[in-house]
């Protein structure tokens, strides 16, 4: 039985088998979590879909892992700050409504 995509084709895209397994597992988790797919798939399983994306070159290992970590941290921090700002606005609105209610 020949598996598609073949391991030889995939190893042309990724430097090692270990890197391939890690990349495939991470991408499969992303797909299962609802991440948008980069192409139409022949496969049903997320693990095979991830391999199809790797084979097509749509998913690659980031060339600078420390830069990727920094960008992920920055995105998480921005999301946290946006959430805090939203909570602050809600608290201000509640306080204003309480104040307006006491004046009546």
UniProtKB/Swiss-Prot annotation:
GO MF, one annotated term: DNA binding
Catalytic reaction equation(s): RNA(n) + a ribonucleoside 5'-triphosphate = RNA(n+1) + diphosphate
Organism for this UniProt entry: Streptococcus agalactiae serotype Ia (strain ATCC 27591 / A909 / CDC SS700)
The protein's role, per its UniProt record: Promotes RNA polymerase assembly. Latches the N- and C-terminal regions of the beta' subunit thereby facilitating its interaction with the beta and alpha subunits.
One example of a Gene Ontology biological process annotation: DNA-templated transcription
Cellular component aspect of the GO annotation: DNA-directed RNA polymerase complex
PANTHER family given in the database record: DNA-DIRECTED RNA POLYMERASE SUBUNIT OMEGA
The name this protein goes by in its record: DNA-directed RNA polymerase subunit omega
């Amino acid at each position: 039985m020949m598996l598609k995509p073949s391991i030889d084709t995939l190893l042309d895209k990724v430097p090692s088998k270990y890197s391939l397994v890690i990349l495939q597992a991470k991408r499969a988790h992303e797909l299962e979590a609802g991440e948008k797919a980069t192409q139409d798939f022949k496969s049903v399983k997320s693990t095979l879909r991830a391999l199809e994306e790797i084979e097509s070159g749509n998913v690659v290992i980031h060339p600078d892992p420390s830069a990727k970590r920094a960008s992920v941290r920055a995105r998480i921090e921005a999301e946290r700050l946006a959430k805090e700002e939203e909570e602050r606005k809600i608290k201000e609105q509640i306080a204003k409504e309480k104040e307006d209610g006491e004046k009546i």
